[in-house]
Amino acid sequence: TGSVLKKETVSLNAMWGVLFTLILILYMGLRPVSVYFGDTVNYAKGFYTAANSRDPFSWQWEGEWLFYNLMQWFARYSDIHTFFLLCATVYIGSLWLAMQRIFKGYYYIPFLVILSMFTFWSYGVNGIRNGMGASLFILAMTYVNRPPVMIGLCVLAAGIHKSIYLMVGAGTLTWFIKNSYWYLAGWMACVGVSYAIGGRIQAYL
């Protein structure tokens, strides 16, 4: 542990962290469109449908507005690999920046822990919107002392995936309610709601 925390090792890890992050973004973002990457093919199908549409691009504010506006724009003016590269940059880059803000020069090891999670790759190539939204929300939480930035990032995250509204709501509650017993009661209530109408809630999200 001592060698990991040495100044020389920390500097080296920081350098390798940047290089490894860039390589990983390129590797994930420039992947081929294949069924081996889960919903990548479904996103590609929607992308090509938009690319072949004759309707002019117009900004929409409904649903997951940010993600689909970006997809529509890239479908008309760029290509799918550049779009997936942007998605990977947001997904991985937000996590990288969040770890840097939390752990400063010692971010490399925590960042590697995130990359080693079994869900990491899946959220990057399969549940793309989920991964991007969650990463932006994690980054937003590092700006808790700068509310305008935090709120702005939360708005962008929710514009990528609607499930982020749940996390934003939970974060808002912790801002005002400090008594942990209320959270226990809320958790028990959520179990009941999930049992009663969980299917309808999941379908909406």
Region locations from a protein language model:
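Short hydrophobic/aromatic helix or loop-helix immediately within or flanking a transmembrane segment
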Residues: 41-52, 56-78
